[in-house]
Each structure stands twice: as C-alpha cells, then as structure tokens.
Amino acid sequence: MTPQPPLSAAGLPYRQGVGIMLINARGQVFVARRLDSPEAWQMPQGGIDAGEDPETAAWREMEEEIGTRNALLLGETAGWLGYDLPEELRGRLWGGRFQGQRQKWFAFRFTGQDADINLATAHPEFDAWRWVDVDTLVALIVPFKRPVYEQVVAELAGFAVPQPA
C-alpha cells in the first residue's frame, strides 16, 4: 500500500505514481515522445491504482505504455520523488485534482528485442521512442520534470552500464 499523499501548498494532493528507467544491454535508457506534447520526451510513468503496490504498478505501466514486460527488476529509488505541475497545466491534467506527482522510480533491464516494444497499445501515450545515453537524458525532459529526472539519474544510473555480450 502507498502512503496517503500530503497536501500541497495549494491544498491539492499529489497523485501517487511510478516511473520506469528501462535500460538496454548497451546501458542506454528508453525514452518516448508524448502524443499530446511533441516536444516532451520522458521515460514511462503512470499512476498507482487503488490497492496496488508500486512495483506492481510499474510492471503494469510498462506493459500499458510500451507493450512489453520483457525486463528484469534491478532496483528502485530510496524514496518518493515529486514535482509540481506548472500552473498552466494544473487545471488540464487529471481534471485539476492534483498539484503534481509523487513517484517511486524503478530501474529495469530490458531483456527483449527492440521489436518487442509496441507503442500502439490500447491507450497510446507515445508516438516515437529511442534509446539514449544516461548522461543526455535530463536535457530531453520538460523543464518542470528535470529535477526529478536528475534525482532518478543520481540514484539509478549505476544500473545503466553495458552488459557483456
């Protein structure tokens, strides 16, 4: 079970979610471009359903967003990482019910082939994807999420190393 989200200064709660750092055998990280915002690249992420634990949510979100579960769990962030939505997005996303998100992030080793990744899922969120070096990741991300991505990289980049052939 996840803890109750705290209220923000604006009086709105934070949405509880998970994020996924999917790492290929070359030590590169998966990023995808959002359908609703072509300038926005991100790693897969999503909400935690009622009664769902964060790890289960991460596996579900991976399959829902990129069409695969071909992965091995490597680790997770020590705590929850959060961001506030910019004012101009707060009223549009999630019906204006949340100030931002608090997320538990997980590192996974991708064990499949690139052909296993399928963005044409039941509810597509992305229209393109690629593998990037971890040191270029943060620069691709929308500014309001960058501090979280910096923390994710600081905690999980140690898993982003090439694997022996």
From Swiss-Prot:
Its cofactor is a divalent metal cation. One of its GO terms (molecular function) is guanosine-3',5'-bis(diphosphate) 3'-diphosphatase activity. Its EC number is 3.6.1.-. A motif (Nudix box) lies at residues 46-67. Keywords: Hydrolase. Residues 13-154 form the Nudix hydrolase domain. The keyword Metal-binding does not apply. The keyword Hydrolase applies. SUPFAM superfamilies: Nudix. One of its GO terms (biological process) is nucleoside phosphate metabolic process. Belongs to the Nudix hydrolase family. RppH subfamily. PANTHER family: NUDIX HYDROLASE 26, CHLOROPLASTIC, UDP/ADP-SUGAR PYROPHOSPHATASE. Accelerates the degradation of transcripts by removing pyrophosphate from the 5'-end of triphosphorylated RNA, leading to a more labile monophosphorylated state that can stimulate subsequent ribonuclease cleavage. HAMAP family: Nudix_RppH. This is RNA pyrophosphohydrolase. The gene is rppH.
